Amino acid sequence: MKTPRLPIAIQQAVMRRLRENLAQANLKLDRHYPEPKLVYTQRGTSAGTAWLESYEIRLNPVLLLENIDTFIAEVVPHELAHLLVWKHFGRKAPHGKEWKWMMESVLGVPARRTHQFALQSVRRNTFPYHCQCQQHQLTVRRHNRVVRGEAVYRCVRCGKPLVAG
């Protein structure tokens, strides 16, 4: 799927939110953390990722276009919080107490680990598998590993191997 073109107004709204959150954090933490690089190259079902070493936030343009307001209000500060935790505390658990504190006390945003966006437009084909207790959907990559005999996946609930079909 080709990456959609983001209107400049949306990019500006994202940057505005990022700068507001960063200014707020710098003020509350009495620091001068730099502005991270923002790129719109995230793919798949992830709304965004924070890359610590390159100090970069990657955002999913498809999910952004489909959920503009919620995406800007939640995903941008979520990813910024990861970078700020890394700068302020060093390497910590991705959604640990430091991240939660950064989200809620510093940025004033509810600390949610995952988004609730509809994923139909970004979800790849999946393959049905089952165990004794439920149905599962495996990605193409996992399905191919099963077919080649490279992997056996088990249900986290019952522990039984997953079977195609």
Swiss-Prot record:
Its cofactor is Zn(2+). The active site is at residue 79. GO terms for cellular component: cytoplasm. Zn(2+) binds at residues 78, 82. Residues 22-163 form the SprT-like domain. InterPro entries: SprT-like_domain, Uncharacterised_SprT. GO terms for molecular function: zinc ion binding. GO terms for biological process: response to stress. SMART domains: SprT (SM00731). Pfam families: SprT-like. Transmembrane segments: none annotated. It is found in: Cytoplasm. Keywords: Cytoplasm, Metal-binding, Zinc. The keyword Zinc applies. Binds 1 zinc ion. PROSITE patterns: ZINC_PROTEASE. PANTHER family: PROTEIN SPRT. Belongs to the SprT family. This is Protein SprT. The gene is sprT.
